[in-house]
């Protein structure tokens, strides 16, 4: 009888270990899923993000420009948007940097942007940064993420580092209806790389997700002989309501 009970106990322990391992594995794999991006791309009103992030959020939008006659020199625009959940207030700040060929940078200007509602901000007309923001739109306002676009696509590269808590996938595309043409270069007609990156922390503890679109065959197409070569956008928050939807 004792031997029988021992076998039952061992079996129950093994079942428990298997269940725990399976649950952890499923959670591990769920954190490598990017389907949640359908909630954010596109977004037509930044205030919609408050329902996902109860303790504030930030959107970091970066765009880089190459200019004719300045080889190796990059103009970088960084826009940091902050949403305060308690007051439902949204504020933004934009910085203009000159990145030199040796990758050192020179800060040229910092300006405050006034939120107008939706995904719109008042852009100053009399600043150095103004010319780079004439057609400014958030990536989340224009990019339409559809999981089916990537279901059959083979990633160029997968970076998976649980130790540092990060996961990235990079794809190569030549055409895609998902990409709009409002960024100073028509991504839909260019060869480009698109990259998705994220924190592997459970979403209900911490959320950090980045999407980057980088052109590979850019040519200046504007009167200023300037074209965007990179558009990157990160959504970051201390806590989210997405964890229960994994």
Model regions and ranges:
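N-terminal leader/targeting segments and the immediate start of mature chains
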Residues: 15-66
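N-terminal Sec/ER secretory leader and immediately downstream segment
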Residues: 52, 57-98
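An acidic-aromatic
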Residues: 78-135
């Amino acid at each position: 009888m004792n031997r029988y009970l021992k076998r039952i106990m061992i079996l129950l322990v093994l079942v428990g270990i298997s269940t725990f391992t399976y649950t952890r594995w499923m959670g591990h794999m769920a954190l490598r899923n990017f389907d949640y991006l359908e909630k954010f791309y596109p977004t037509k009103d930044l205030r919609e993000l408050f329902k996902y992030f109860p303790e504030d959020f930030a959107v970091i939008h970066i765009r880089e420009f190459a200019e004719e006659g300045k080889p190796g020199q990059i103009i970088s625009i960084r826009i940091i948007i902050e949403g305060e959940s308690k007051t439902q207030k949204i504020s933004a700040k934009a910085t203009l940097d000159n990145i030199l060929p040796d990758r050192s940078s020179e800060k040229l200007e910092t300006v405050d942007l006034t939120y107008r509602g939706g995904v719109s901000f008042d852009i100053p007309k009399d600043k150095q940064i103004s010319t780079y923001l004439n057609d400014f739109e958030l990536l989340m306002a224009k990019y339409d993420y559809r999981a089916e676009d990537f279901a059959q696509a083979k990633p160029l590269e997968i970076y998976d580092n649980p130790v540092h808590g990060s996961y990235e996938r990079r794809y190569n595309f030549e055409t895609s209806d998902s990409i709009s043409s409002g960024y100073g270069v028509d991504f839909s007609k260019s060869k480009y790389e698109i990259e998705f990156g994220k924190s592997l922390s459970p979403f209900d503890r911490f959320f950090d997700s980045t999407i980057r679109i980088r052109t590979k065959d850019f040519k200046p197409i504007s009167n200023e002989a300037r074209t965007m070569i990179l558009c990157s956008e990160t959504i970051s928050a201390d806590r989210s309501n997405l964890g229960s939807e994994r």
